[in-house]
Amino acid sequence: MPHRPAAPSPNLPREMAQAYLVNDRMNQLLLEHLDPRAWRAKLPGQKGRTIADIFAHVHNIRCKWLRLSAPHLKLPAQLDRHRCTPKQARAALAASALCCSAMLAEALAVPPGRVQSFLRDGWARPWPPGAAMFAYMITHDAHHRGQACMLAHQLGFRLPGAAGYALWGWEKLWKQCGFELPTGPKSNRACV
């Protein structure tokens, strides 16, 4: 008997908006366990960003996406990468994640909400709302989260093992965000 693929979840837009908040929970978890000495530390002889710079950038880029793609949403204040503290960064990231989640919910709604296109920057062509928008937003955060983890490690401030593994505990992260983990049909079959 041929395998029939499962139908997409009817709650897919809501689940994608929630997944963005779970993604930010990973940022929060990283910052909760980051040694404070790593926040502004620099590698000797390097001109790269500090961890403070990285997370200020993540937040400020989210604000740019919101300003360009969802101007009807109230923007959180931008972060000054030279002055922000880890506590301020955590609060700002939480605020911009909520706004980005709201933007995704509107962009993916049927019928569509007020978000008609996704603009990454003034130079970039607009994208229609959808999977590419969601993937780009998640990938941007994940890329910079990886940079921060690697930089902390290189600086000698490696995350505690349990914190590093917790970044991959999706079931627990979903629950920490107050969401019910999406479930699908049980199958022992490999993807074909």
Predicted regions and their residues:
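Short, contiguous alpha-helical
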Residues: 2-3, 17-31, 38-81, 118-187, ...
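Acidic catalytic patch
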Residues: 106-123
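Short, mixed-charge, low-aromatic patches
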Residues: 10-15, 48-58, 99-107
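Short, solvent-exposed, charged loop/turn and helix-capping segments
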Residues: 34-38, 106-109
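Short, contiguous pre-domain boundary segments
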Residues: 1-12
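Soluble or luminal CAZymes and related metallo-dependent hydrolases
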Residues: 8, 19-23, 92-96
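Helix-adjacent hinge/juxtasegments
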Residues: 67-109
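Active-site rim elements
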Residues: 10-17, 86-90, 134-138
